[in-house]
């Protein structure tokens, strides 16, 4: 039986608890991601998807419940402690790399897990450079010829593709993708999604992707979760979501939740 990489048990998240503005953002979430699962999580604004991802990442303290990664209880661990198990790609392409360092320096730093001491003491070795060239060439963007370019001079799509490589260089137990194509134009977004899918499949990674794009949620990954008001409304495996269209998904959501999805950010993303 395939191991559970992520286990969430009875997870509740409150904001401003005990005040007139109390928001019960997550309501007893139970969720497991098994090794090799690539789950896309969608839902309207306020559904709880970003709160869920931030709770897993450690950037939001858990109100109640438990989070385990690769069998380790990380419920009360900091973001820094969890970084040994998790890699995260943010929405902003500028957030995952050091703009004044070159492409190869950023990749080298990622390989050394952000250890500046190891980075400055050894620099970029020839064998590392050869690996970087090979990995960059596999992206099909010509970036293998830009190793010495400052990463801050690259386009958002190029930078996000490199950030994906950096995030997966050391085979994280869990890859978190936080609307990582939302800031890109449609054509670049499609390219980065294809690269994402390729990396996740070839590296046999376990990944959780937050997205507003229903087409991407249907096209990519082997599992789809739709959230509503802090709960999981729909949970489909690869076979169940195969052949579904956006209208099918919207109809399913209405049947499960009793209401139609009205968030334009989701409805217009296809």
Question: Could you describe each region identified by the protein language model?
Answer:
Residues 2-5, 14-28, 78:
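A short, flexible loop at the N-terminus of ABC-type nucleotide-binding domains that lies
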Residues 19, 23, 73-87, 95, ...:
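ABC ATPase NBD coupling module
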Residues 42-44:
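The feature captures the beta-strand-to-loop junction immediately N-terminal to the Walker
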Residues 57:
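Helix-to-loop junction immediately C-terminal to a conserved catalytic motif
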Residues 65-73, 236:
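Conserved ABC transporter NBD signature motif
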Residues 167-168:
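ABC ATPase C-loop
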Residues 211-212:
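H-loop/switch region of ABC-family ATPase nucleotide-binding domains
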Residues 242-270:
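ABC ATPase nucleotide-binding domains
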């Amino acid at each position: 039986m395939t191991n559970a990489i992520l286990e969430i048990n009875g997870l509740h998240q409150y904001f401003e608890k005990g005040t007139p503005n109390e928001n019960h953002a997550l309501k007893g979430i139970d969720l497991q991601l098994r090794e090799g699962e690539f789950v896309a999580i969608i839902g309207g604004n306020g559904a709880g998807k970003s709160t869920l991802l931030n709770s897993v990442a450690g950037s939001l303290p858990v109100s109640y419940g438990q989070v385990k990664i690769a069998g380790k209880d990380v419920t009360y661990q900091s973001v820094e402690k969890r970084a040994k198990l998790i890699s995260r790609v943010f929405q902003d392409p500028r957030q995952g790399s050091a703009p004044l360092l070159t492409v190869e320096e950023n990749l080298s730093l990622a390989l050394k897990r952000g250890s500046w001491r190891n980075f400055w003491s050894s620099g970029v070795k020839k064998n590392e450079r050869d690996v970087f060239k090979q990995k960059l060439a596999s992206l099909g963007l010509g970036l293998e010829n830009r190793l010495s370019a400052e990463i801050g001079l690259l386009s958002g799509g190029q930078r996000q593709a490199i950030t994906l490589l950096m995030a997966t260089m050391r085979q994280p137990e869990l890859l978190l993708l936080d609307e990582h194509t939302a800031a890109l134009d449609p054509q670049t977004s499609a390219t980065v999604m294809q690269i994402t899918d390729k990396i996740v499949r070839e590296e046999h990674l376990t990944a959780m992707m937050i997205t507003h794009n229903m087409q991407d949620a249907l096209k990519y990954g082997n599992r789809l979760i739709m959230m509503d008001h802090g709960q999981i409304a729909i949970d489909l495996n690869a076979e169940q979501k195969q052949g579904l269209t956006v209208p099918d998904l919207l109809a399913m959501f209405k049947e499960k939740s009793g209401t139609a999805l009205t968030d334009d950010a989701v409805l217009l993303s296809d």
